[in-house]
Amino acid sequence: MNLTERDQKYNWHPYTQHKTAALPIGIIKGKDALLWDENNKEYIDAIASWWVNPFGHSNSFIADAIYKQLTTLEHVLFGGFTHEPVVKLSEQLMKVLPSNQQKIFYSDNGSTAVEVAIKVSLQYFYNKGIQKTTIIAFENAFHGDTFAAMAASGISFYTQAFQGMFIDVVRIPVPVKGQEQESYDALQSVIENKNCAGFIFEPLVQGAAGMVMYEPESLDKLIRICQENNVLTIADEVMTGFGKTGKTFACDY
């Protein structure tokens, strides 16, 4: 059996309806922007396999650094312990994160980062003895595939099978040009009528919704409304962070 046939015997793939989807391509190696399959056919990885766009495949600098670290310390529990690489990374990240950030909590990926942020928002008020259990999100938002992240997402393609199981999320319109006041009014109304813990948003651009853009000034207005009403804000920069909008973070605008 070739690689694809062996794969199909055991594996389910994400975002795939296996009854109708084309068979996956069996890739055996990559270098920079190129991939090669098991027949040595060359492909341009035009989507950077989602996650390697800053550095390409098989980056020798990264490979050498990983090898060096593995020969020193491959893992230590982060509860009750710390280590040089994580402290150094945090020190470097604080130099580029927006200036209002003070602490870092590490997670596995974008979805679980959103999951943690939502849990922190809810537990913040729980710890204070304040009943706030609603999260505010934009219409047609996408925040990930774990449960709270799906709850905050507004695209039914990803969430319809799980409706009725989610935390309480209320949606407001995106403040696109000409509809800013509608968004402001909706946010104010939700805050006045619900016990809102947090507002999660994709800053300046909604990717999965179809690259829906809105202005920094509109986001600033929404954030001010939240701050005035003791509602925490969560900037989901999984798609926009680290230079993808021009500045290091979209929240820097």
Give the location of each predicted region.
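Conserved N-terminal phosphate-binding loop of PLP-dependent enzymes in the Aspartate aminotransferase
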Residues: 1-253
